[in-house]
Amino acid sequence: MRTWVLLLAAGSGTRLATAGLPDAKQFLPLHGAPLYWASARTMAHVAGIEGIVFVFPPHRVEEERARISALDDGSVLGLDWHVVGGGAARQDSVACGLAALPRSCEAVLVHDAARPFASPALVARVLSALHDGHAGVVPGIPLTDTVKETTDGFVANTPDRSRLVAVQTPQGFTLKALSTAHETARTAGWNVTDDAALLERCGIPVRIVAGEVVNAKITTPEDLAMLDANEPQVTVPCVGWGYDVHRYGEGRPMKLGGVLIPEGPEVVAHSDGDVLLHALADALLGCIGAGDIGLHFPDSDAAFDNANSAMLLDRVLHMTHEARLRLTHVDLTIVAQVPKLSPWRDKIRANVARLLDLPVTSVNFKATTEEGLGFTGEKRGIKAIAAVTGLRPMP
């Protein structure tokens, strides 16, 4: 299902303006970029997403288009993207985003830019439920507080908390269902606070999937503490080194850096055998002192049989994010007599940069041989070496 994201960043930030902030919340800085960029990077880590439509206040469209072009230098996102102006209300902004989607789009994720901490796993959960055939999907978390309905300042009713969830974004929809719901809302004059409510009113079932407590929305001045908590103040450099080997033989088609190498020999492996991503994952784990991939994804576990190495790398990246590692550079080397990799060098480099959310200029890829010596020279296998550098918060 061809899926795009509507990243809503068109709000005026009225509640935060009362705190004297000079800009709306979606433009506040986080990790050296505007808040909305964190969500864009998250979406880029999820397989199956083809592009993003950024929806900004109309007067910010050109400014933010230029800013995204600078941030995406070297195709950091690895996705198509467009920038459009929003409307006076949230529904209007979603409608503006829908109008900018390509004709090939079949499904859409609607996400609030003020939720910068949604994880790739959460996005993938929503996307998976869409692929299962649901027309609408929303993440939700159980309520921990008792909720009261009030009238004129007095308690009127206490709903059963066990039947309530607090919903979040991204919310996923088939394009047909969401477009129909918005058209019906315009005709009927409905005004709701999220897109799932439009489907409800149209009688279209909406599936709930597990949300994340950390996926909080930056709304009030008190919420700004979450941004401060995600900005390490003092960092120290760190280095990680990774090494992996696979032998040739009947097994898996060769993949390097997530790129299929059709002329390469098959490799014997428990997972999909991407020796380059395995070495890279080990190097990343080394940077944060978290062991190696054999510890986290043992070959004795059937769950990882033919596992997608890009998925394993994404799990490792989640660990590095939790450790607040800021990756700065990656240097990768393949040692193999065959196949010849020069035709694939740029594609491998670009894909690794996309997976790591780094500029291509921060990823180096080399291929060499051992001049006919050893098992690689005898065309019996392949080696990969990875070195990564980064910055971590000072202990």
Curated annotation (Swiss-Prot):
Pathway: Isoprenoid biosynthesis; isopentenyl diphosphate biosynthesis via DXP pathway; isopentenyl diphosphate from 1-deoxy-D-xylulose 5-phosphate: step 2/6; Isoprenoid biosynthesis; isopentenyl diphosphate biosynthesis via DXP pathway; isopentenyl diphosphate from 1-deoxy-D-xylulose 5-phosphate: step 4/6. Its EC number is 2.7.7.60, 4.6.1.12. Residues 1-237 are annotated as: 2-C-methyl-D-erythritol 4-phosphate cytidylyltransferase. Residues 238-395 are annotated as: 2-C-methyl-D-erythritol 2,4-cyclodiphosphate synthase. Keywords: Isoprene biosynthesis, Lyase, Metal-binding, Multifunctional enzyme, Nucleotidyltransferase, Transferase. Its cofactor is a divalent metal cation. InterPro entries: IspD (IPR001228), IspD/F (IPR026596), IspD/TarI (IPR034683), ISPD_synthase_CS (IPR018294), MECDP_synthase (IPR003526), MECDP_synthase_CS (IPR020555), MECDP_synthase_sf (IPR036571), Nucleotide-diphossugar_trans (IPR029044). A divalent metal cation binds at residues 244, 246, 278. The record marks 161, 217 as: Positions MEP for the nucleophilic attack. It catalyses: 2-C-methyl-D-erythritol 4-phosphate + CTP + H(+) = 4-CDP-2-C-methyl-D-erythritol + diphosphate; 4-CDP-2-C-methyl-D-erythritol 2-phosphate = 2-C-methyl-D-erythritol 2,4-cyclic diphosphate + CMP. HAMAP family: IspD (MF_00108), IspDF (MF_01520), IspF (MF_00107). In the N-terminal section; belongs to the IspD/TarI cytidylyltransferase family. IspD subfamily. Bifunctional enzyme that catalyzes the formation of 4-diphosphocytidyl-2-C-methyl-D-erythritol from CTP and 2-C-methyl-D-erythritol 4-phosphate (MEP) (IspD), and catalyzes the conversion of 4-diphosphocytidyl-2-C-methyl-D-erythritol 2-phosphate (CDP-ME2P) to 2-C-methyl-D-erythritol 2,4-cyclodiphosphate (ME-CPP) with a corresponding release of cytidine 5-monophosphate (CMP) (IspF). This is Bifunctional enzyme IspD/IspF.
